Curated annotation (Swiss-Prot):
Belongs to the TYW1 family. Its EC number is 4.1.3.44. It comes from the Eukaryota. CDD domains: Radical_SAM (cd01335). FMN binds at residues 97-101, 187-221. It comes from Schizosaccharomyces pombe (strain 972 / ATCC 24843). Gene3D superfamilies: 3.40.50.360, Aldolase class I (3.20.20.70). One of its GO terms (biological process) is wybutosine biosynthetic process. It catalyses: N(1)-methylguanosine(37) in tRNA(Phe) + pyruvate + S-adenosyl-L-methionine = 4-demethylwyosine(37) in tRNA(Phe) + 5'-deoxyadenosine + L-methionine + CO2 + H2O. Pathway: tRNA modification; wybutosine-tRNA(Phe) biosynthesis. This is S-adenosyl-L-methionine-dependent tRNA 4-demethylwyosine synthase. Its cofactor is [4Fe-4S] cluster. Keywords: 4Fe-4S, Iron, Iron-sulfur, Lyase, Metal-binding, Nucleotide-binding, S-adenosyl-L-methionine, tRNA processing.
Length: 688
């Protein structure tokens, strides 16, 4: 239907309102729809923000590893309540000591807490002899740690403990906050404020407190420190007051708030009150790397080693006269090295250019008095100084035997010229940065070198030059048993040992596996030893029963762990049987070549050292030095010598030119040698 303009004009006023409504209606509808959409999007955005916020709250409580792994949040959420189940939480008192003071303090803390908390299950643990990874990388859930630490300006095992904490914090393989599962911790430090003031006072206890907290643990009580120059009674009173404050905190079931230290004696300072002292405390050590002495003359380590008969040379070397040297000078017999290799004991010097070691072996006869470490961080003495020092100290010790009843004049005269050097005294000789230069100086003086390594430094072994005889200690055949026997410091100790054995196979020189048998620890898995022999294919295998070196709080060994000689023989025979069965593809055969019954020692050798049906395990020393001077390549068969009949298996291994000495006992007469082997073993035999 059409409308004219005239008609629209006549009726415009009548229909104008309706027309406006029709035209504006789509706009209104569009506006309403858009408004509704905006409100809907706003609600969704708000919900999304709430969800993100919730996720962030959850993540805040989760352990996130440095590789991005997320752990359980339960422990951290629980920790928000600051509650402690002190009746059921494992409680450990740790300590480290050189002179014994910190040990006495730790025992005092242990006894006081046991009494106050009415608990008989509190553990007292020496940091030097526990697996640090079991306590400070993975820890017992809800455990409570108390740490009693002295501080030394000299090198000590505390340096290794602190470096382990720092490495755990920096190691991407270690989950973040590994100690978050602890209910709490507290540290007590001992320091000499008069002699070591300022930033040296209790600096290692301060570092321990700092690193344990960085690893996720929550401080149970402020760090306590005491001045050891106070009167003994004042020191003990201060220690007990700190211990009681910890016990009170545990009984209250809550973490002690910072600043709540009114109960502490004025003789005990907490970390918050130390102010600038805490700020000054060095992050690593009191002295830069390379300036600390491994064994200072003022250190408890020095005093302990000298008390045991060692002469400490320079800052990290040592020498000692072994019992077999004294025995040989009296004509009472030589050690097993004479039976096996032709070394006359009075011509041999036992020494080491490194008193530090990377293991804390259960059968070590130093009872923890030598330093430990995984990397060289000390002052380095030059090899010339070390060689001159150990020779001087060795000869000085020998002079003390002049005129001693029973000493043979000809043996005493011969002993004034060292012919052999056994680098097996203590520690890890190959650890010394200039070991090759040191050995070369020995050879220049025509002193043979017998170097023993614990198979924990593969790079040093790979770079090791020619020695007269190169040993690797193989103290166990499985990873777990090696960990139990050697208590190594390296986390990858097993891989390091396997690598060292492979490197040994590449060496074109006389190589030896030294196996120390510890009953109840490493005598069961005989078959597994054959696989280790496959890796290194040594020229010789020395098998020796462990020497009992006396009781020690740090060693679990007793006389029950010392095998009888018959048991050592049985082990060797079974080992050879397994080698014949499982290593036929190598084309190498092993047999028993020699023995030294008095030392519970047997030598197994490759049959290649049997010439015309007779063993040649001894060494032609003049020939060896002649070959060294040519500077040409040579091998182990180029300087071998005939083994004497007395050393053959079945003949005992005692030199016929000497007289066997039997120590008389008040309660019994001498027994046959086969029955008394384990009982006559001495510290020096283990060192020989």
């Amino acid at each position: 239907m059409g409308y004219s303009l005239g008609y629209i004009g006549e009726h415009w006023e009548e229909y104008r309102a309706v027309l406006y409504i029709v035209l504006l209606l789509p706009v209104l509808i569009h506006f309403l729809i858009r408004r509704k959409t905006q409100l809907s999007n706003s609600d969704k955005s708000s919900e999304k923000k709430d969800e993100v916020k919730k996720q962030r709250e959850v993540k805040r409580f989760k352990r996130v590893g440095k590789r991005g792994k997320i752990g359980s949040p339960s422990s951290s959420i629980r920790k928000q309540n600051d509650t402690i189940d002190w009746k059921n939480s494992p409680l450990c008192v740790f300590y480290s000591t050189l002179g014994g003071t910190a040990e006495r303090y730790a025992k005092q803390v242990h006894e006081e807490l046991s009494s106050l908390l009415q608990r008989d299950d509190i553990q007292l643990l020496n940091l030097d002899y526990v697996d640090l990874s079991e306590y400070f990388v993975s820890c017992p859930e809800n455990a409570i740690y108390l740490v009693v630490l002295p501080s030394y300006e000299i090198e000590s095992s505390i340096d290794y403990y602190l470096s382990s904490l720092q490495e755990s914090f920096s190691d991407f393989r270690v989950p973040k906050d590994p100690l978050h599962g602890l209910s709490g911790y507290a540290v007590f430090g001992l320091g000499d404020m008069e002699n070591y003031p300022g930033d040296k006072f209790c600096y290692q206890a301060i570092q321990a407190d700092k690193w344990i907290k960085k690893l996720g643990a929550r401080r149970l009580a402020p760090l306590g420190v005491v001045n050891t120059q106070l009167a003994p009674t004042a020191q003990i009173d201060a220690l007990l007051q700190w211990t009681r404050s910890v016990a009170e905190c545990l009984k209250n079931g809550t973490l002690l708030k910072i600043g709540n230290t009114d109960s502490l004696s004025s003789d005990v300072m907490d970390v918050e009150d130390m102010g600038s002292m805490m700020a000054k405390a060095k992050a690593e050590a009191a002295l830069p790397v390379g300036t600390k002495e491994m064994v200072s003359t003022e250190s408890p380590t020095y005093k302990a080693l000298t008390k045991q008969g060692y002469s400490v040379v320079g800052s990290h070397s040592g020498v000692k006269i072994c019992r077999w040297t004294k025995s040989a000078m009296r004509g009472r017999g030589f050690c097993y090295k004479y039976s096996f290799y032709g070394i006359r004991s009075h011509l041999c010097m036992e020494a080491t250019p490194s008193l530090a070691c990377a293991n804390k072996c259960t059968f070590c006869w130093r009872h923890g008095t030598n330093p430990v470490g995984t990397s060289w961080r000390w002052k380095v003495d030059p090899p010339e100084m070390i060689l001159q020092g150990i020779l001087k100290a060795h000869y000085a010790k020998l002079k003390l035997m002049k005129g001693v009843p029973g000493v043979l004049p000809d043996r005493y005269e011969e002993a004034s010229r060292v012919r052999h050097c056994a680098l097996s005294l203590v520690g890890e000789p190959i650890f010394y940065p200039y070991i090759n230069e040191f050995v070369s100086m020995l050879h220049e003086r025509e002193i043979s070198s017998f170097l023993v390594t614990n198979a924990q430094h593969p790079e040093a072994l790979r770079n090791m030059g020619m020695v007269t005889q190169l040993y690797v200690s193989v103290d166990a055949s499985t990873k777990q048993s090696l960990k139990s026997v050697d208590r190594p410091l390296f986390k990858d100790f097993w891989e390091r040992m396997l690598t060292c054995l492979e490197i040994l196979r590449e060496k074109r020189q006389r190589t030896v596996y030294r196996m120390t048998l510890v009953k109840g620890f490493n005598m069961e898995q005989i078959k597994e030893y054959t696989e280790l022999i496959r890796l290194g294919v040594p020229c010789f295998i020395e098998v020796k029963g462990v020497t009992y070196s006396g009781n020690s709080d740090q060693s679990p060994l007793t006389m029950k762990n010392v095998p009888y000689y018959e048991e050592v023989i049985d082990f060797v025979k079974k080992l050879i049987e397994y080698i014949d069965i499982h290593l036929q593809d190598l084309g190498v055969r092993y047999e028993i070549a020699a023995e030294h019954a008095h030392s519970c020692s047997i030598l197994v050798a490759q049959t290649a050292f049997k010439k015309d049906g007779h063993w040649h395990t001894h060494i032609d020393y003049p020939k060896f030095f002649e070959l060294i001077r040519t500077k040409k390549d040579f091998g182990p068969f180029d300087y071998m010598a005939s083994t004497p009949d007395f050393a053959m298996f079945g003949n005992g291994g005692f030199s016929p030119e000497d007289t066997r000495f039997h120590r008389k006992k008040k309660t019994q007469t001498s027994k046959p040698i086969s029955a008394t082997i384990s009982e006559t073993a001495t510290i020096s035999e283990a060192a020989a």
